[in-house]
Amino acid sequence: SVQSAQLGNDALSKSIHAGIIGFIIIILFLLLVYRIPGLAAGFALLSYVELMLLALNGFDLTLTLPGIAGIILNIGMAVDANVIIYARIREEIAAGKTVKSAIRIGFKKATSAIVDGNITTLIAALVLLWRGSGTVKGFATTLAIGIFIQLFTSLVISRGLVWMLYHMGFQKPAFYGKERVKRTIKFVEKR
């Protein structure tokens, strides 16, 4: 069946609107849970969106619904990368490291997991580009381009922002969130 141009524009508009709402909720969550690193992640995610739109424009690609899906998937992957990094930082702080050391070690420990996850997704995107048809290729193209951009924003821009905030005076462990206390219930002892 053929859809009207108005129906396609309406779906595109609603997708963009939903993406913006989701983006705001994600940033609020990152700020609440990760504090200062969450602020850095928010700016890194904004950088991702800006760079992605510049790349789409630079490659003269049209923004379609499958393209938006690729962008949103990459935003999710970027959030995941930042969560992995900041969880590592919190673990290092909880283990008694200084904030400076925790930032350095946290990024170092998280990098290989983030790169590995993105390589597997890139392989899938390349297979979709190779074997897919029209809309699938549009999704795969934005996904592949977005992987490189979100790796850059997660591992370079986010790192730079965290260090910048650290050097601006945000050096207390409390600014980086607390490792949650793991509560265990000792059922055997309660008898």
Specify the residue positions occupied by each region the protein language model found:
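A cross-kingdom feature of multi-pass membrane systems that activates on extracytoplasmic/periplasmic
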Residues: 1-5
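Interfacial segments of transmembrane alpha-helices in multi-pass membrane proteins
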Residues: 9-64, 130-134
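Hydrophobic alpha-helical membrane-associated segments
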Residues: 25-31, 77-81, 127, 149, ...
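Small-residue-enriched core segments of transmembrane alpha-helices in multipass membrane transport
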Residues: 38-60, 71-76, 139-154
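Hydrophobic alpha-helical transmembrane segments of membrane transport and translocation systems
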Residues: 55, 91-191
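Membrane-embedded alpha-helices of multi-pass transport/permease systems
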Residues: 79-82, 86-89
